């Protein structure tokens, strides 16, 4: 994960890294900390310390890290981040998550309306959209389109694919599952 993330970033094959002005990292492992240090040679990096336990002290530390990150972003972009903007961003992201969850729900049907790889292409593709407010509507429209095509896929074993990250390499896993008679449902 670390090696491929770093490689994609420094070779400009990762659109997230390519289009970013700053990388926000976290301290989940020593390998990632080193990766962020090396990425700092290419772009500004801010690393957030994650608390090791869920405690009052850990929550205090996490709140301080969030505030520090906000201050770094405000200075870098010369823009004061208001509480109103944060609330709005939360609403936008929650609407996107809700629409994606609703889209995934169609894969619960006895007769599936689409292949898992098609579903993955839809949702993965939307991660590259810069108009975050439009995403929920796009997902809803895609869901309606899929359901209107009236496909009835049956007789396949349903497979749930999880992990971190669910990125480009996941496509190969889904293809393997579906080329061997299964179907990735989420």
Locate the predicted segments by residue.
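Trp/Phe/Arg-rich N-terminal binding region typifying the photolyase-homology
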Residues: 1-83
């Amino acid at each position: 994960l670390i090696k491929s993330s770093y490689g994609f970033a420094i070779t400009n094959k990762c659109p997230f890294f390519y289009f970013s002005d700053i990388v926000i990292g976290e301290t989940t492992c020593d390998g990632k900390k080193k990766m962020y240090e090396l990425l700092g040679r290419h772009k500004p990096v801010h690393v957030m310390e994650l608390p090791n336990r869920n405690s009052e002290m850990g929550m205090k530390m996490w709140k301080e890290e969030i505030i520090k990150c906000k201050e770094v972003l405000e200075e870098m972009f010369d823009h004061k981040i208001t509480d109103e903007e944060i609330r709005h961003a939360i609403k936008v992201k929650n609407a996107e998550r809700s629409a994606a969850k609703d889209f995934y729900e169609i894969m619960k049907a006895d007769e599936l309306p689409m292949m898992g790889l098609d579903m993955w292409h839809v949702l993965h593709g939307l991660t590259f959209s810069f108009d975050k407010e439009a995403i929920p509507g796009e997902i809803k429209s895609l869901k309606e389109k899929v359901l209107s095509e009236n496909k009835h896929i049956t007789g396949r074993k349903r497979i749930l694919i999880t992990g971190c990250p669910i990125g480009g390499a996941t496509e190969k896993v889904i293809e393997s599952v579906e080329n061997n008679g299964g179907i990735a449902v989420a």
